Amino acid sequence: MIVHAASERQALQLRAQVARRLAECGLELNEHKTHIVYCKDRTRRGSHEHQRFTFLGYTLRPRMARSKYGGEFVNFLPAIGDDERKRIGRVIRRWRLHRRSGSTLTDLAEAINAEVRGWTNYYGRFYRSELVRLLTRINEYLIRWACWKYKRLRRYPAKARRFLADVYRREPGLFAHWRFGARPDGWTMGAG
């Protein structure tokens, strides 16, 4: 549960009220998970012990944002959580794409697209550049896959990257992370 308050004093009062109400229902606040967090941004410039929290897989903390006029400022924004980023990184590693040299790119795309689409649909809603940075790891594994699959690319990862970039230009929708913006040619789309 997240409760917003205008001041620290009001937050302490609200926490006490919530604790009383939960006690009436035979429940109690988890002291380990219950924090008062200062939502630092361009208008709130103070400091507090806790300036970030994780909720539903997102980490909310002060982040740089761009105004509609092109200027940058600090805002309190959600992005994929640190624990979720690590978990997804482990899943990507566990796929061992680079070792599947008997498979085609289409086979690899069919194997991973459903899961990647789920990640992009959920975690890509806010601060998508954090997720794009994570999804570019898939491209690194695909480059290694190309080096294993094709003898002419074996010791030339730059050529393998160009090979994948050519595939992207021919079939930009082959992989879900390419459609999301994690392109194999080193550019990103819509992740600014």
At which residue positions do the language-model features occur?
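Non-catalytic terminal/accessory segments
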Residues: 1-192
